[in-house]
């Protein structure tokens, strides 16, 4: 009789090491080295020694987490958030803000030096480390056991939600809504069929967008309207389409003397204070004169375009999202700016035949998405502006696109790290390029 042998399941033994961190990467992970291998340890600061367990091991690097902290860095601080370490929203509240900014700035400098050969120490633009976030999107889950709606962010490395009691990175006016909103949503008849919730703090007050999976009953709409009136909220509802305003005023914010109206689904910078500084620094770097023509690529709804139009002879804005182009046109008209023109064009395609592409420009600003702007960089060189300001939410694509400008006769003269998202690993940046022919 044949006998079959089934081997027992192998149990992988995770390595436990004692290491000392020497650095902090841009994502807030401690960097240590063990037998020639680089270790990235979440929760460990430079100078700290800890017992760590490896969660992932590759040939040249490994990742791990702290199981026991042996020594403490003077730059370790107590997180202000009661959910720190569990919530996936912030990763660096245990690190002093100066250390966070230093690590991000150094990471940007190293990357740009390695990829472009230009070594420039970035200036840092930052605001308050807490209370800065004027926009947030929250998941909603119905808890059968408690019969309540859980409102929160995802847990780190999980799809489960953290039931938020507080969120100190939110603007205080938004943070104050968290607990009352949980009560309101838990009392709705549709509480089992809610999608997600967005909160935005406009200059004229907070707004809420509730996305629901089924049509709301009249009683639920009345309950939400009563809550919005009591809290001074503009209320939008969405069943999958564009949000519909049920109550309150359309939102806007002001930037450099211009009022920008926006729709809830429009992109706006999360950090109002850093956005204002960023726009001001970009204008200073471009040094726009009254007789100059300026091009704003990936212009959105006019965050840079309208301030530029107050300085220049003429400004052209190009954007790929039609709704943002319409909003930008309305904003220019409402601000009495007749020297600005907007084009709806796909900047990821060949731009040479697009309507704006044959015009001449003295200065150019671009603010692309994470993928960067490979489709327009060669054309920017052909347009031969005297200065180019590149605003980036991804330093890797900034470094890549910079090479086209450097090879085309431009010099990288200024670099800036924008701490748009304190306590997270997100790094935003801005660079100034000047024509070597000047």
Curated annotation (Swiss-Prot):
Domain TRAM: 4-68
PROSITE patterns (UniProt xref): SAM_MT_RNA_M5U, TRAM, TRMA_1, TRMA_2
UniProt GO molecular function: 4 iron, 4 sulfur cluster binding; iron ion binding; RNA binding; rRNA (uridine-C5-)-methyltransferase activity
Family matches, as CDD domains: AdoMet_MTases (cd02440)
Alphabetically ordered keywords of this record: 4Fe-4S, Iron, Iron-sulfur, Metal-binding, Methyltransferase, rRNA processing, S-adenosyl-L-methionine, Transferase
Residues that coordinate or bind S-adenosyl-L-methionine: 269, 298, 303, 319, 346, 367
List of catalytic residues: 393 (nucleophile)
GO aspect biological process, one term: rRNA base methylation
Source organism superkingdom: Bacteria
EC number(s) from the headed UniProt entry: 2.1.1.190
Keyword rRNA processing: yes
Reactions this protein catalyses: uridine(1939) in 23S rRNA + S-adenosyl-L-methionine = 5-methyluridine(1939) in 23S rRNA + S-adenosyl-L-homocysteine + H(+)
Residues annotated for [4Fe-4S] cluster binding in this entry: 81, 87, 90, 167
Family: Belongs to the class I-like SAM-binding methyltransferase superfamily. RNA M5U methyltransferase family. RlmD subfamily.
Job description of the protein: Catalyzes the formation of 5-methyl-uridine at position 1939 (m5U1939) in 23S rRNA.
Protein's name in the database: 23S rRNA (uracil(1939)-C(5))-methyltransferase RlmD
